[in-house]
Amino acid sequence: MRCVPVFIILLLLSPSAPSVDAHPMTKDDVPQASLHDDAKRTLQVPWMKRGCCAMLTCCVGR
C-alpha cells in the first residue's frame, strides 16, 4: 500500500503529450519517416540486391 501514493505522485509529475502540435507545419518542413517506413525500407534493400521476391519462389533456381 505504500507504493500507491508514490505511483500517483510520479504519474502527476510526468509530462503529458500536448494534444495539439506546438509548431504549425510550414512549407519548408519535411515530414519525418516513421519507424515502420524505416523497417520496411531496410527489409526491402536485401531483396532488391539479390533479385528475389518475397515468397522465395523465384530464388529456388538460382
Curated annotation (Swiss-Prot):
Modified residues (Valine amide): 60
Tissue-specific expression: Expressed by the venom duct.
Keyword Acetylation on entry: no
Annotated keywords: Amidation, Cleavage on pair of basic residues, Disulfide bond, Neurotoxin, Secreted, Signal, Toxin
GO cellular component, one term: extracellular region
Record keyword Signal present: yes
GO molecular function: toxin activity
Highest taxon of the lineage: Eukaryota
Prodomain positions: 23-48
Post-translational modifications: Contains 2 disulfide bonds that can be either 'C1-C3, C2-C4' or 'C1-C4, C2-C3', since these disulfide connectivities have been observed for conotoxins with cysteine framework V (for examples, see AC P0DQQ7 and AC P81755).
Annotated InterPro entries: T-conotoxin
Locations listed in the record: Secreted
Annotated family: Belongs to the conotoxin T superfamily.
Record's protein name: Conotoxin Qc5.2
Source species of the chain: Conus quercinus (Oak cone)
